[in-house]
Structures are given as C-alpha cells and as structure tokens.
C-alpha cells in the first residue's frame, strides 16, 4: 500500500474514532442491572481482547454467540472450552460445538454458566446466616444458511435457567431468540446486523416465596439491536459494532465496541480493543495438535468498571 493510500486509511480511522467519542454519550452501564447481564458480558478471549464487537466478525470459538449468521460460514467442526477468572467471587465458564452442514448451512450448540459464590447472608439484625451462591445457565441452539456465497442469515433459540438462594433456592426459566445476517462484501470488508434477546425473559413464580399472595412475574431482558463491521486495510483487522439497547418503552442505552488484531509472525496474534472505553488486550497462539493448525489458545486481559478490577479469560479451540 502506498503512502497516499496509507494516509487515507489513517484519516478514516481518526474520523471513525472521533464519531465514536461524540456519539458514545450513554453508557451500557444503564442496563447492567437488568436480567440477562451475564449474556452481555462476553465469551471468548479472542473476541473480548478486541472489545467484543463481533457483530460482523467470525469467532470460531463460539460463532453463534455474537451473531447466529456466523455459523453459515463454518468450514470445519469446532469444539471450544473457555473460562473467565473474574474478581468479586464471580465466574463464567462455557463450552460450544459447531459444524458445517453441506452444502451451505451451519449448526452450533453452546452452554454458558455464570454465577456468584460466597454471598454473605445476614438476617434482619445483621447476624450472619451463612454463605450463599447464585447461578445462571443459557443454552444456545444456532442455525444459519447462506442465501448466496456472500450473505448468511441465522437464528439462535436460547433457553435460560436461573437459581437464587431464596427460600431454599428458587429457580426460574425462560427463552429468547436472536436473528441476524452477515454480508461479506469483499476480503477487506464485512458487514453484520443482529437483533438479540428478542422476547427474552425469566418467568418467576413468587408464590414460592409469598405463598398464596404470590403471582407470576416476568423479568425481561433488554433487547439489543446491533450493527457492525470488519475492515482489513492491510496486515491487521479492525473490528467494531454499535449496540442500541431497548427495555420496554422507557429505558434505553447504547454501547460502542472497537478493536483490532495484528499478526506479527505466523500463528501469533496480538490484539487490543475497547468496550465503552474500557480497554482490553490479548494474544493468541495457533498450533498443530492432530493435524496442521487445528488448535488455538487465546488469552484476554479485560479491565472492568470502577471497583471490578481485572478479568482473565482463556479459550481453547480445537478444529477437526
């Protein structure tokens, strides 16, 4: 790429970052307290090290998580395990499997488990009553099909389960749907769009707590509407997306995520990104286990919001 082309790329990047700064006024912290927050945290080290804005990008570790249309571009069968080492006695672990369905489709299944341990229980007088824990599960079923070589449409069906340490551990169940598409315009540009957590909610029966005075309560997830891109100007990738969150008719928020990956040498990847101006960095190593370049180990270091500290994310992917 010549000096003129390089300067134009740098100018476009500067303009884009300026737009991000001007429009990212509302923080996604506004929806942090609503149901399903563990699904908005992120999954693989690969994606989180670049800010997590993978609406248009392909994440082989969990292709259906960010956009179900991604599984339409699978070329192999992938199995993935990941672990988040989180502060404040929190945890998140996940596993997924995905495969190509000839001639033009893909299928994926994944499970996410998150929770909090060592919750200090107290009675009305302040006396300690013990340590408690809470946990949530989400099962993803993803399917996508390429309408043409460059366009894939996909859908996720998600099943939720949550357990709270109230009255001997009560639980709730729920479902949700995602739908999206990805357009691979060229080897240098990809675009994506997804609606996530449509009609997603937990259904609680408060009669388990208040006996005959209880009722059925629906705890809705904020719906996400996202648009994203992948741009490859040279020896590195630029990945990002914009998310609009909608909760009923009254609560809304937004989020910008942006990151990049550079390959300094074969099979070595260096990454960095931001998620609403919270930085993250990471790296990846691809190697041969059973066949050439069939395994990858990724790591991400993520800075949380004030008071949260650092999170360490490890992901292992095997293609077969």
Q: Across the structure, where does each feature detected by a protein language model lie?
A:
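Cleavable N-terminal export/targeting peptides
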Residues: 1-36
């Amino acid at each position: 790429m010549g000096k003129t082309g390089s300067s134009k790329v740098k100018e476009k990047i500067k303009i884009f970052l300026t737009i991000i700064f001007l429009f990212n006024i509302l923080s996604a912290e506004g929806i942090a307290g609503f149901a399903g927050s563990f699904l908005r945290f992120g999954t693989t080290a690969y994606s989180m090290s670049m800010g997590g804005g993978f609406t248009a990008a392909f994440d082989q570790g969990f292709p259906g998580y960010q956009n179900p249309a991604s599984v339409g571009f699978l070329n192999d069968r992938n199995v993935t395990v990941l672990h988040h080492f989180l502060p404040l006695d929190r945890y998140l672990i996940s596993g997924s499997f995905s495969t190509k369905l000839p001639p033009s489709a893909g299928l994926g299944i994944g499970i996410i488990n998150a929770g909090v341990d060592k919750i200090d229980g107290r009675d009305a007088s302040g006396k300690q009553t013990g340590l408690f824990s809470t946990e949530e599960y989400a099962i993803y079923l993803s399917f996508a099909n390429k309408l043409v070589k460059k366009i894939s449409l996909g859908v996720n069906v998600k099943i939720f389960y949550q357990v709270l340490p109230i009255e001997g551990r009560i639980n709730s169940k729920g479902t949700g749907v995602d739908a999206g598409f990805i357009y691979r315009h060229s080897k240098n540009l990809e675009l994506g769009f997804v609606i996530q957590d449509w009609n997603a909610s937990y259904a609680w029966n408060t009669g388990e707590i208040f006996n005959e005075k209880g009722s059925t309560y629906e705890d809705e997830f904020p719906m996400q509407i996202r648009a994203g891109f992948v741009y490859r100007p040279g020896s590195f990738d630029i990945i990002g997306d914009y998310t609009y969150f909608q909760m009923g008719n009254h609560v809304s928020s937004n989020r910008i995520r942006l990151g990049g990956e550079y390959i300094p040498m074969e099979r070595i990847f260096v990454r960095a990104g931001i998620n609403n101006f919270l930085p993250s960095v990471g790296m990846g190593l691809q190697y041969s286990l059973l066949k050439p370049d069939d395994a990858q180990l990724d790591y991400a270091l993520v800075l949380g919001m004030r008071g949260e500290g650092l999170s360490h994310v490890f992901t292992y992917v095997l293609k077969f």
